[in-house]
Amino acid sequence: MILVTGASGFVGRSVVKALRTRGKEVRCFIRTPYREKTVADYHVEMAYGDILSLSALKGAMRGVDTVVHLVAIIREKRNENFDLINRRGTEIVTQAAREEGIRHFVHMSANGAQDNPSYPYLHSKWQGEQAVISSGLTYTIFRPSIQFGDGDEFINTLAGMIKAFPLVPVVGLGKIRLQPISVDEVGAMISLVIDNPR
């Protein structure tokens, strides 16, 4: 059994689809009850809770041998900041995984994650990675680039801007290279690493 945190999110839906396509049993950890409809077609188990709740996570991990941790935020809100969700949340998920004897922990980080507080999002993702690395668990960390697909917020917004205006935005004076990846490709890669922990 595989537990996917953030299963109802943009990446989570693709991961769940890829895992189920490969015949894997999946339990989805979802915070907001009505969001299960986004993965209901895949015939998965549901567990509800918050990644900041150790007891909810441990309950969801019973009978699970692999955890795919996808919960993260890319924009801060009043009650959710990068440190709380991306760092502390990952620490709590790894603690629950360790205490429940999880065999393999798969963590989704971000391309460019770094130990530099000048970039709060990337720094929080790096701190999350450190929590995974120091957890004692067998782990795999993914650092995908910007992802596109149904429901993405970046590429679709960029495409809309290009359609609306005759200008194409240039990132970093044109010297920064972006190599977007399909969210379905990310889901497929995560589903493949489940059987090959490294």
Residue ranges of model-derived segments:
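Conserved Rossmann-fold NAD(P)-dependent oxidoreductase catalytic core, especially the SDR/UDP-sugar
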Residues: 27, 73-74, 82-145
